[in-house]
Structures are given as structure tokens and as C-alpha cells.
Amino acid sequence: MRMPEHLQRLIEPVVTGLGYELAGIEFDARARVLRVYIDHPQGIGLDDCSKVSYQLSGMLDVEDPIPGQYQLEISSPGLDRPLFTLEHFKRFTGRRVRLQTLRSLDGQRRFKGEIAGVRGDVIDLEDDNGLHAIPFDLIDKARLIPEFDI
């Protein structure tokens, strides 16, 4: 899942300028919702989201990158963090992920397994059926599967 580049160019400098990492951007055209995921080594709280929302709202009102009205949502990536970049897949190698591809690969579009590694622009995903080499450009959506110690 890629971040919309035109939005990333506008949003990332604001988010990083406030001391946060831009973890991802999603725009749901049907619901008219722009979701911006932010992260920080010390975690994200409501005050962090409010601060980023205030700064982004002003900039987005001026730049007007999305025609019409929409709702802006700022949040942490959460336990089931979406993965947007190759760097995200590298960072979370060894973790379990659920992903969907744009078209069928190895006879399926939905995968659930462990990120075994990243080679160039290919994600190696291991599941019960073996190792799948999934080109990054074919990934539509990907999210970590939360792990709980019981």
C-alpha cells in the first residue's frame, strides 16, 4: 500500500517538523476521510494527534490538495499497524502480517504469514504453504497482526 505521493510531499514536512514520524497516509474516497498515521519512539497520545491535526488543517486548507470536503483523522499506527513502505517491511521482518495483493499471485490474493525478509523490491512472506516472493508494487494493503503474550 503506497502513500499518495502528492499528499506525502505536503504532509511529511509538517509532521517531521513537529518531531514525529509520518507512518502513513490513506485517503478513503468513498467516506471522504484522510487518515494520517504518526509515530514517535515514546508513543502517541491525544495531545500529539491534536497538535498535528491543528498544523495540518491549516496547511491543507491553504494548499487544498483534495477537492471538496473531507474529514481529517490523525492517529497512531496502532497494534495492527498498516505497512506502507519497503522500510516498514524491513523494520518488521520476523513479524506476522496480513496482506492483500492487487491481483492473484500463487493462486491467491490474500496472504497471512511472517515477513521473512526484503530483497530489493520483493517481500518474502512465509506461510503454511511455503515462501512467497511478493513484489512490493503488487501489494494493495498490508497490516501487522498483533501478538499478545498470554
UniProtKB/Swiss-Prot annotation:
Its main location: cytoplasm. SUPFAM superfamilies: YhbC-like, C-terminal domain, YhbC-like, N-terminal domain. Keywords: Cytoplasm, Ribosome biogenesis. It comes from Methylococcus capsulatus (strain ATCC 33009 / NCIMB 11132 / Bath). InterPro entries: Ribosome_maturation_RimP (IPR003728), RimP_C (IPR028998), RimP_C_sf (IPR036847), RimP_N (IPR028989), RimP_N_sf (IPR035956). One of its GO terms (cellular component) is cytosol. Belongs to the RimP family. The lineage of its organism: Bacteria, Pseudomonadati, Pseudomonadota, Gammaproteobacteria, Methylococcales. This is Ribosome maturation factor RimP. It is found in: Cytoplasm. GO terms for biological process: ribosomal small subunit assembly; translation. HAMAP family: RimP (MF_01077). Required for maturation of 30S ribosomal subunits.
